[in-house]
């Protein structure tokens, strides 16, 4: 009897424990459901998923594979633009001028202090004029640029832009990047159909493979919000966290820039950028205001000496300063001593997009090249002109799949201009860098002497660099003309087996520089775009109701 009572008590305890466990589990599920509903009312729950090896914040609507029709129907925007840098601000103004309702979301709307994006080539200025934004270089103390001066081994030569056929106002411009962007933001925000908001976009909202909008943290960073539009254009710059879902990013960092400002001194060649072919890599000087000269020292590799422990200052004084033109030496040392040294990795990334309905990439988020030639803004503004012209015939952007197919033509139409500037930047950087290889040394010397010849030998390359004549065949011709000129210098007047071998290595080295870049850009799209079917895409026809 005792044993039986003990078993009965144990059974009762077990049943009570099981009932308590079941009640706790039901209570947990009920609480979890209430929390989820509360978060959805506030703007949606968030979670993390891995896309292409990178973490991406996704909304509950993305996780469930849909966003409600009410959310989309409730939006009055035609286009969402992520980022209000050069590309984003110019695009917002351009699309709004065409009557689109534009919502711009920018991480930081205060004026930035950057060491790149400070030189706009004449070709880029012409695109500004075409977009109606040329007045944005006014009232920021921007300086006109009429060409470049090259220095190497105590020699120098001046290369002027071929501006004779253009209006007197056409020239390059150099300025503080932050001032220029603020002017463009102000101009875009002055239009009644542009809404510019400070916030951090964390993800794209997708439904069945179509981008419907974005989720973002508001200015205070506490609340999540969502914005919806038929077309989302991502222009969030070189540090883009959204590009992974819209392209295959293959980012290379060949070098870093170390930035200094020299004050109250003029450059030896007024209104010209200065490029010193130093060892191990180039040094740039150009004016960014009436009293300031920007100096950019290229340091190969992904790391620079430490600023904190003085290694970088020591490197600049001992390795770089002796190669600076004498006229700038004292100001260069003074700028180092002042201590306001900034660094920036130089990225390059060929454009390799995924055609995604409802979304598009632009600017440095989409395509980057070495900043040596200052071509980035020219490419971005040229792309914006193309996008504007492609979208102009369209009244409605809601048919995402049809719009996506139509906009595939953009990727082909942009190639001749963008690929020429990209290839020139990558090739010129490699040619201008010092090398222990004798053939590479000969190529570098030949390039300097070829540009010093004048006539077509200087006007052709500088027209390419300026963005005034961005033709792939012209680039190809001049690049190999430099190589052949180098071989000719070796073989004349008395060729020898050693010189012939060196000449062969020079041609081989030149091919090894340019052909991989052309391959990454796409040979067919770059040189023969008219053979690509997307080149001929016509605007979709809107059916009448």
UniProtKB/Swiss-Prot annotation:
It comes from Panax ginseng (Korean ginseng). Pfam families: DAO (PF01266), SE (PF08491). Pathway: Terpene metabolism; lanosterol biosynthesis; lanosterol from farnesyl diphosphate: step 2/3. The record marks 148 as: Important for enzyme activity. The gene is SQE2. One of its GO terms (cellular component) is endoplasmic reticulum. One of its GO terms (molecular function) is squalene monooxygenase activity. It catalyses: squalene + reduced [NADPH--hemoprotein reductase] + O2 = (S)-2,3-epoxysqualene + oxidized [NADPH--hemoprotein reductase] + H2O + H(+). It comes from the Eukaryota. FAD binds at residues 86-87, 106-107, 114, 185, 201, 364, 377. The lineage of its organism: Eukaryota, Viridiplantae, Streptophyta, Embryophyta, Tracheophyta. Keywords: FAD, Flavoprotein, Isoprene biosynthesis, Membrane, Oxidoreductase, Transmembrane, Transmembrane helix. Induction: Repressed by methyl jasmonate (MeJA). Accumulates in the presence of squalene. Gene3D superfamilies: FAD/NAD(P)-binding domain. Belongs to the squalene monooxygenase family. Its EC number is 1.14.14.17. The chain crosses the membrane at residues 12-32, 475-495, 500-520. This is Squalene monooxygenase SE2. SUPFAM superfamilies: FAD/NAD(P)-binding domain. Its cofactor is FAD. One of its GO terms (biological process) is response to jasmonic acid. PANTHER family: SQUALENE MONOOXYGENASE. Coiled coil: none annotated. Weak expression in petioles and flower buds and barely detectable in roots and leaves. In petioles, preferentially observed in vascular bundle tissue (phloem cells and parenchymatous cells near xylem) and resin ducts. It is found in: Membrane. It is an enzyme of class 1 (oxidoreductase). Component of the triterpene saponins (e.g. ginsenosides or panaxosides) and phytosterols biosynthetic pathways. Catalyzes the first oxygenation step in sterol biosynthesis and is suggested to be one of the rate-limiting enzymes in this pathway. It is a multi-pass membrane protein.
């Amino acid at each position: 009897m005792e044993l039986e009572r003990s078993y009965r008590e144990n059974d009762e305890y077990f049943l009570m424990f099981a009932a308590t466990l079941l009640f706790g589990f039901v209570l947990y599920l009920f609480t979890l459901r209430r929390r989820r509903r509360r978060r959805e009312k506030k703007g949606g729950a968030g979670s993390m998923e891995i896309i292409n090896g990178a973490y991406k914040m996704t909304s509950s609507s993305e996780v469930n594979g849909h966003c409600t029709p009410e959310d989309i129907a409730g939006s009055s925007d035609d286009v969402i633009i992520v980022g209000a840098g050069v590309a984003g601000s110019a695009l917002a103004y351009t699309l709004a001028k065409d009557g689109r309702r534009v919502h711009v979301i920018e991480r930081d709307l205060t004026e930035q202090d950057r060491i790149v994006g400070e030189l706009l080539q004449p070709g880029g200025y012409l695109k500004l004029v075409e977009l109606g934004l040329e007045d944005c270089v006014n009232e920021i103390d921007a300086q006109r640029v009429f060409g470049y001066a090259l220095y190497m081994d105590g020699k120098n030569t001046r290369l002027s832009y071929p501006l004779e056929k253009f209006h007197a106002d056409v020239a390059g411009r150099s300025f503080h990047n932050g001032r220029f962007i603020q002017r463009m933001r102000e101009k875009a925000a002055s239009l009644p159909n542009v809404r510019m908001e400070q916030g951090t976009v964390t993800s794209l909202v997708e439904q069945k493979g179509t981008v419907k909008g974005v989720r973002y943290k508001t200015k205070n960073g506490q609340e999540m919000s969502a914005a919806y539009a038929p077309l989302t254009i991502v222009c969030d710059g070189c540090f883009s966290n959204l590009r992974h879902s819209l392209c295959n990013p293959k980012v290379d960092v060949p070098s870093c820039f170390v930035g200094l400002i020299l004050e109250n001194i003029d450059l030896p060649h007024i209104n010209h950028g200065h490029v010193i072919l130093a060892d191990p890599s180039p040094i740039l000087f150009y004016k960014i205001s009436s009293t300031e000269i920007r100096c950019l020292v290229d340091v190969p590799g992904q790391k620079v000496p430490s600023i904190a422990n003085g290694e970088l200052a020591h490197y600049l004084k001992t390795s770089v300063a002796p190669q600076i033109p004498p006229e700038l030496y004292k100001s260069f040392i003074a700028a180092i001593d002042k201590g306001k040294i900034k660094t920036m990795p130089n990225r390059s990334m060929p454009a390799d997009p995924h055609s995604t309905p409802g979304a598009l990439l632009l600017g440095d988020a989409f395509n980057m090249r070495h900043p040596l030639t200052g071509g980035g803004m020219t490419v971005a503004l040229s792309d914006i002109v193309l996008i504007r012209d492609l979208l102009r015939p369209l009244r409605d952007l809601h048919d995402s799949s049809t719009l996506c197919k139509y906009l595939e033509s953009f990727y082909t139409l942009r190639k001749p201009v963008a690929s020429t500037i990209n290839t020139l930047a990558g090739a010129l950087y490699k040619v201008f860098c010092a090398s222990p290889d004798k053939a590479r040394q000969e190529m570098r010397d030949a390039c300097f002497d070829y540009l010093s010849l004048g006539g077509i030998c200087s006007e052709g390359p500088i027209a390419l660099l300026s963005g005034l004549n961005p033709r792939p065949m012209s680039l190809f011709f001049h690049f190999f003309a430099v190589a052949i000129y180098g071989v000719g210098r070796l073989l004349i007047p008395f060729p020898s087996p050693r010189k012939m071998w060196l000449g062969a290595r020079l041609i081989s080295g030149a091919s090894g520089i340019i052909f991989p870049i052309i391959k990454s850009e796409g040979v067919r799209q770059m040189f023969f775009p008219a053979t690509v079917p997307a080149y001929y895409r016509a605007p979709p026809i809107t059916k009448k109701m």
